[in-house]
UniProtKB/Swiss-Prot annotation:
Pfam families: NLPC_P60, Prok-JAB. The gene is gene 19. Residues 1-120 form the MPN domain. Belongs to the peptidase C40 family. This is Tail tip assembly protein K.
Length: 243
């Protein structure tokens, strides 16, 4: 970034302090410009939600090339949510600390390995792991049902696993479970709220809330909480699927 752009970002961080500032860097031909954006977060001292209208205004001017936000009274160390959102935007993120005035840039990491992912609801969660498994193993893009709120709590109407497994391409099947089947579970909730993938050797690949993604033996606790096992209909060798 050019010094003029950095100066504009620091001035915005100072003006918004102790709230998090947010904005974008845009490029038009050889001209680089910082666009301050409104932070619409309900907790602006802890998080940022960049105004879609302000983002669109920057896009109208040129090409958005980076996302910017500040960490008030903290270092530039990115949180797991920062990293996950950077991955999702496919753009560099510039993080500034204020009042220290430090600057750090993080880059999108691409597709993460299936094991030992950090948990970030709405990004790296149980359905996110299932999506990545099918993308990495079969080249299949499943529908993205991820949301960043605890939809399994009774105060929310959503019931994604129970309502959406069929429309997403999964089917009941005849015969025993096999590698690649989707295991839908109900864990400390009144709804089906967790899922994993069966692996060879009766292992379960899953990503539990607040934990790293992992492989565990499928039995006992997880088997007792299993509500349904289904199979993706369009994978070669899955002819046992029902219509």
């Amino acid at each position: 970034m050019r010094q003029k752009t950095i100066d504009a970002i620091m001035a915005h961080a100072a003006a918004e302090y102790p709230r998090e500032c947010c904005g974008v860097v845009a490029q038009k031909s050889r001209v680089e410009r910082y666009f301050p954006c409104r932070n619409l977060s309900a907790e602006p001292t802890e998080h940022f939600h960049l105004s879609p209208e302000d983002y669109a205004a920057a896009e109208d001017w040129g090409t958005v090339v980076a996302i910017v936000h500040s960490h008030p009274d903290a270092t530039t160390q990115p949180s797991e949510l920062d990293k996950a959102q950077c991955d999702a935007t496919l753009l560099p993120w510039h993080i500034v600390s204020w009042p220290e005035g430090d600057l750090r840039t993080i880059q999108p990491r691409g597709e993460l390995p299936l094991l030992e992912r950090p948990f970030v609801l709405g990004h790296f969660d149980c359905w996110g792991l299932v999506m990545s498994y099918f993308r990495q193993t079969h080249g299949i893009e499943l529908h993205d049902y991820r949301v960043d709120y605890p939809w399994w709590e009774n105060s929310y109407p959503d019931n994604f696993y129970q309502d959406c497994w069929y429309e997403c391409g999964f089917r009941e099947f005849d015969g025993p479970p096999q590698e690649g089947d989707l295991v839908i579970m109900q864990v400390q909730a009144d709804k089906w709220n967790h899922a994993g993938i069966l692996l060879e050797g009766n292992m379960l690949l899953h990503h539990l809330y607040g934990h790293l993604s992992q492989r565990v033996p499928y039995g006992g606790y997880w088997q007792e909480r299993t509500m349904k096992i289904v199979r993706y209909k369009d994978v070669r060798g899955n002819e046992a699927c029902r219509k």
